[in-house]
Amino acid sequence: MQVKRIVVLLLLGVLIGAMPFANAQESEIPLATIVNDEGGPVNVTGEVAYTSGFFTLGVDEPLIILEDQAGFVDRDRGFLMSEASQVIGKITSDFYTSPFTYSLDLPIEPAGSLRDVDQDGDSDTGVMIYAVAYWTNVWGDAFLEERDLYGGGWSAAYASTHIDQNPSSGYEVIGGKYIVYAPDDQQGFPSGFGEDDKLFTDDDPIVRLPAGYTLVDMDTDPFTFDRSKNPVIPLIEGEGAAQDDFSNLSYSEAFDEMIEMFRKNYAFTELKGIDWDEKKATFRPLFEEAEANEDYLAYVNAIRDFIWSIPDGHLFAPYDDTEFFNAISGGLGMSLRELDDGRVIVSYLLEDGPAEIAGIELKAEIVTLNGKPIDEAISENVPWSSPFSSTEVRRLQQLRYVIRFPLDSEVEVGYQNPGDSDVATVTMKTVEEFDSFRFSSFNIGLTGFENPVEFELLDNGYAYVKIYSFSDSERLTIQLWERMIQLLNDNGIPGLIIDMRQNGGGSGFLADQMAAYFFDEPLVLGNSATYDKSLDAFYSDPDVEQRYFLPPVNQRYNGVITVLIGPNCNSACEFFSYNMTLQDRAAIVGQYATGGLGGGQTTFAMPEGLVLQYSVSRPLDAEGNIIIEDTGVAPTVKVPVNEETVFAEGDVVLEAAIAYLDENAG
């Protein structure tokens, strides 16, 4: 026992002897130089300015939160901040008007992740590091879960931090402001980026923080440590999210900037074989002429013609409404369809319209138009709905616009009525009628009053759901979607028909995660490549693959599924449809492929208040191949386009889907 007592005393002596040495080590870390020492932040206010044309799209529940930065400290893209750490602020002005303002009260005892960042090799308590960040809440309760957080990590835009926007950088923090909480006055924190210009690395210079909250301004060298009671922290949109703005330039100067922007950032230059020098030589004179003549309409038409020259259906071309109306207001009272066998026939005939009065019958084959073979006339037409990614969609729109003319135009049509052996020719004058134009519209039947998701139980026992948009209210969309899934499971519905035929797209992430309700594995869906200034090349970050984040097991549906597609399924709609082809999860049913709009979009501003969009990211599958763009998603169950299907009374695509379910959902 005596020996033990001596040993214990010796150990105690060692520990007591070591304690002054440890305190001496801590004291060797210099104290941070504090400005505005009012005891530390209590409330933070600021404003959030945004220029992106998509910032508010689909947003119902915008949030300003304290964002735990442990994910960045660890360089962990999958880091999920806990609910307890999510201190939610108040938005204090109109969110839909930029800039909006916020106010955030700091908790007395925060619950973020502690990280030891003093780089001394010892294990210390560490500090809690926060950014102020904007998020939107879509799933679940008032806090952000994995899907709201896009799988985790840290904010790259609309935060108090300034992020390196080059995709190859790993989205390093390169400036901005942190709010740091130290549980005592013995914790170290960087006072600069060090020689490697990176934060939280071995070469960081370290200072010791006072206990409590300190605002760290990383835009100064060394960092500024501010203990103001009520600091003001604006959130940074970030170069990658901000809209390029050429609106204050002359027409020709704005065109030059636009061309250079397209040259570097446009996602499909090689895929589509675009020569930007050639486009500059072709279109710059139009902008110069419009500028010299101060001719606004000529300027708009120059932009229109430039955009129309790029075969990308995501691009929007402005045009003069009066010119458009004058060009298409004259109709012949008929619509056209092209059959699989190559014939172009009359699919709609207006009663007492010019075509019917002239003797043209329903199902008549149109052979010539204004003296040209119908195929040539169609191919030469430039639809007002241009441009297009898909040649198939362009052809369908050419069929629609080839028989639209100015009012009172004389039009010669060569046709062959059903049962006739000869081709007849007739000259008609166009009248102001839009029934035939509406009949051929991809959006026929839409009223604008549709919910983003509408579903019903069919008489045959299958469920039918139509997704109209991925750009409507995201929270409402998910609530309706999960309500449907619950009903499917509660009632043991064996088959589901998902109608995507009139969906213009929206959030690709929302589309991906809605498809996840039909899977049991967190599949990797692919990636995207964007322009990286530091590399002067497009780059795809392997650490940010797109994947399913699975809903709870009771919110998954395992029945047989068919997806109805068509040429008016665009962008995010196409990604949903593509996702449903993985593991052969659904049969894709349709007469045509989807629209072929695969690029990720951003907006830019031109003179005269014009805001346009263009494709800046390439969609890639899990193997790195470009998907969707130009080709779309093709049907796996192809419904023919022939006289029988064109003139069928019912919905032939829906009927084909039901037939598939009858064979496979028994």
Show where each model-derived region lies.
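Low-complexity, Gly/Ser/Thr/Pro-rich intrinsically disordered linker/tail segments
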Residues: 633-666
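Bacterial N-terminal signal peptides
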Residues: 9-18
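Sec-dependent signal peptide cleavage junction
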Residues: 18-26
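Bacterial N-terminal signal peptides that target proteins for export
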Residues: 1-7
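Short, well-structured beta-strand/strand-turn elements
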Residues: 315, 570, 583-597
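Flexible, low-complexity junctional segments that flank or bridge functional domains
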Residues: 25-495, 502-504, 508-513, 520-526, ...
